[in-house]
Amino acid sequence: MKCEHCTRKECSKKSKTDDQENVSVDVPSPAQENEEKGEFHKLADAKIFLSDCLACDSCVTVEEGVQLSQQSAKDFFHVLNLNKRCDTSKHKVLVVSVCPQSLPYFAAKFNLSVTDASRRLCGFLKSLGVHYVFDTTIAADFSILESQKEFVRRYHQHSEEQRELPMLTSACPGWVRYAERVLGRPIIPYLCTAKSPQQVMGSLVKDYFARQQSLAPEKIFHIVVAPCYDKKLEALREGLSPTLNGARGTDCVLTSGEIAQIMEQSDLSVKDIAVDTLFGDVKEMAVRRHDGVSSDGHLAHVFRHAAKELFGEHVEEITYRALRNKDFHEVTLEKNGEVLLRFAAAYGFRNIQNMIMKLKKGKFPYHFVEVLACPRGCLNGRGQAQTEDGHTDRALLQQMEGIYSGIPVWPPESSTHVQELYQEWLEGTESPKVQEVLHTSYQSLEPCTDSLDIKW
C-alpha cells in the first residue's frame, strides 16, 4: 500500500501482523468456477490485495471485503456464462464503460494508437459476449459542468461567516473515502457535490440508456474498466439507488491490468470495432479527453469557466507552477497585480496531508483544489501502472503520459449530446432532477471496528 506520509509502498508508520499484511481476496478463474476447461482456462487466479488500496485507513469492513470479491473477473465471467446457458428471459445485457485514462495503457501495452487500442478493446469485449462498450468521457462532461456551476455558486456565497471555499474535487474515490472515514466533519463541507464520472455513467447506463432500450435497470450488468482499484470501492459506495429501481449504477469494476490479463490469455480471434455511444447506431469516431495532465480535467475546465463567469476573462493557455514538488501545482488568474483566482492540484497523500494541515490552520489560500490520491494522477493508478513487485513502472507511466497528452482535448461545453441529454433526460440544466441525478452527499463515518485493516 502507499503510505499517506511518504507515498512509499512500505512504511514504518503502519504496523501489521503477518496475517494482516497478506489479507487478499481470491478471484478464481472461470475454469475453476465451471470445473471444466473452457476458452479461458489459461486465466490465472488474480489476487486483489486490500492492503494495496490507497483508501486503507480502517475503511474496508468484512462485509465490504466480501463485496469486493465480487468486483472481479469471476463475477464478469459468471454473467457471461449465464447468458450462454440460461433461458433468454434470464439474460443480462452486458455494458462495459471504459475510462479514458485506461486507453493509454492498452495503447502502450499492445503498441497501438489510442484509437486502434479503443477499437481492439471494444472488439475483444464484444467477442466475449458484451453487448455495448461506451467511453466514460461523456459522463466526465456532466461531472465537470456541474462542478463549474457549483464553484461559481460557492464563490458568491463564500464569506468569513459562511466558508464555502476552497472547493475540493471529489472524483477520486480514494481521496473521498479518506475524507469521509478519517478527516470527517471539518473537511467534508468543502467536497464538491457533483458526482464522479463513474457515478454519472452508472446513471446514464441504468437510467437513460435502460429506458432507451426498454429495459429494467436490473436487466443490465454494468462493468467499468478503470485504472485503479479504488473504483471498486466507489461502486460499493454508490449504494442502491431509488432512481434505478434499487439497482447499483455500477455492478462490477475491473482494472485495466485485469482486462489486459484476460486479453493476453485468450485465444479468441478479435476484430476491431468502433466504440458505441448512447445514441442509437451512432459510433464514437474519435477518442477525446478533457484538459488535464492525468486526470478528468476538473481544474483546467473549472478555472477557465470561473475566470469567464466571475471576471470576464478568457483564458486560453493555463500555466501550471510546481511548488513543493512535482505533484503540487498552482494556477492563478491575475489582473493589475492582484490575484483573482488561485487554484491548485494536489496529488498523492503527502500533498493531501500538507493541504489538510494548512486548511485546518486557516493558512490555505486556494479557492479550488483538484485532489487525487495517486502521485502523478490517474494514469498512475495501481491497476495499470505497477510492476509485479508493487512498484510504479516508471517507463510505462512515462509512455502513457505521452500517449494521453496526444489525445485531442474537447471542452465539455462543446458536446451537443450533453446539451441534448440535459433537456431530454434531466428536464433542463437547472431542474430538480439535475440535483437528484448528478449530485451526491457525504457522511462523516467513524472507522469501523470490523475492518480488514488497521489504523495508522
Curated annotation (Swiss-Prot):
The modification Phosphoserine is found at residue 29. Keywords: Nucleus, Phosphoprotein. It comes from the Eukaryota. GO terms for cellular component: lamin filament; nuclear lumen. Its main location: nucleus. Gene3D superfamilies: 3.40.50.1780, Fe-only Hydrogenase (Larger Subunit), Chain L, domain 3. Residues 12-36 are annotated as: Disordered. Interacts with LMNA and binds to the farnesylated C-terminal domain. This is Nuclear prelamin A recognition factor. The gene is Narf.
